[in-house]
Amino acid sequence: MMSSKPTSHAEVNETIPNPYPPSSFMAPGFQQPLGSINLENQAQGAQRAQPYGITSPGIFASSQPGQGNIQMINPSVGTAVMNFKEEAKALGVIQIMVGLMHIGFGIVLCLISFSFREVLGFASTAVIGGYPFWGGLSFIISGSLSVSASKELSRCLVKGSLGMNIVSSILAFIGVILLLVDMCINGVAGQDYWAVLSGKGISATLMIFSLLEFFVACATAHFANQANTTTNMSVLVIPNMYESNPVTPASSSAPPRCNNYSANAPK
């Protein structure tokens, strides 16, 4: 015998998740489109994502989005580069002047070294070896490279200035020895007195300029070596504490929801 009571079925509520969660500043029932973006949060996110640039000499920060680290170069790089730029120009000009003086006095030494009939001229081993000419040319090249490197400050010019100044310092040291020999071997009988006197004076002058060139070349090579080695130092990498994504999700201050419905939603 069947009962006349209607069969009661459990009420089934189909819950559909809401793809547009309401926020605190939106009216109930108003849904925010997926494509809309909070411009204020986007601007704040872009400011937080961009690392701060450091303008101190020798320190550079990475500002490309998507990178997780900030690269910083050792601060001593800026000091070494500034020292080289300040000193290399003045020292290079001195080297050029010394080179021109060597070539000029070398021509005079060549003229007084000739013998006329039975009268001997000034015997110069420096002229025989050609030191006033190839030495002066080397000094001019070193000075020109130093001046160019102080203006453009490229790695190639700095290395070239370093190499040429080392060569010039060696040549200047050799020239000092040759000029000392010239001052010692002259003054024998049969030489022209005025030629010997002039030759010794010119040799002494060139020796002073050679000593000056030696110290100037060593100083320039020192500054160039500092500028070259400090730029090859390892780069300090600092982890970026900020998020690289310039768009940050809007913070929701909506009240807690029960069964996918807001607590203050109209019933």
Curated annotation (Swiss-Prot):
Residues 248-267 are annotated as: Disordered. It comes from Homo sapiens. It is a multi-pass membrane protein. Pfam families: CD20 (PF04103). This is Membrane-spanning 4-domains subfamily A member 12. Residues 113-120, 182-200 are extracellular. The chain crosses the membrane at residues 92-112, 121-141, 161-181, 201-221. One of its GO terms (cellular component) is plasma membrane. Belongs to the MS4A family. Residues 1-91, 142-160, 222-267 are cytoplasmic. It is found in: Membrane. Keywords: Membrane, Receptor, Transmembrane, Transmembrane helix. The keyword Transmembrane helix applies. GO terms for biological process: cell surface receptor signaling pathway. May be involved in signal transduction as a component of a multimeric receptor complex. The gene is MS4A12.
